[in-house]
Amino acid sequence: CGAERSLSSVLFLVALIFVVGTTAGVISAYAGGIVDIVIMRIADMMISFPGIILAIAISGIMGPSLINAMLALTVVTWTKYARLSRSLVLKLKESEFVEAAIVSGGTHTHILLHHILPNVLPLLVITAAADIGAMMMELAGLSFLGFGSQPPQPEWGLMLNEGRLQLQTAPWLMFFPGFAIFLSVVVFNLWGDALRDVLDPHQDQQ
């Protein structure tokens, strides 16, 4: 029915974007200097293009496949996490407990793993959870347009594309994949809100 491939693909996609973007942002903020300038200029360049249009262009160049569609979406989406993680790390670098760790002779690895990342990850995880629904829509959209999954792979976006050819005679071929996407997006959005309330309970109060 396409559920396993669709759900596992979008979860892997969000995890990939999370890792790439967060790593780039943390390195940019912590290293500073020319490294920060280069990474942020690349991010600014990527943001200047419409995301889905750029993803379609990259998928078209690389060739239609689910893996290439996921890589294309990663290329155009990592900047969000890079900029967010960078801003969080820059604030933490000026905090007293990080300065104390530096003065006490803590290594860069120790400071990153024990002082910076534990304070950065909760907000980034909330952001990632909230993005799952949007990424599902974009990945299904690429498959629907022919740039994602290819037959005979069962994936909801591809099933929508194939079902539209039988819309007059068998409308359920489009209804059920579409409803599955809709339901999954709603569930993931609600889950993201619940996760935000757990990891950041002061958000609503603010």
Language-model regions, residue ranges each:
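Alpha-helical transmembrane segments of integral membrane proteins
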Residues: 1-206
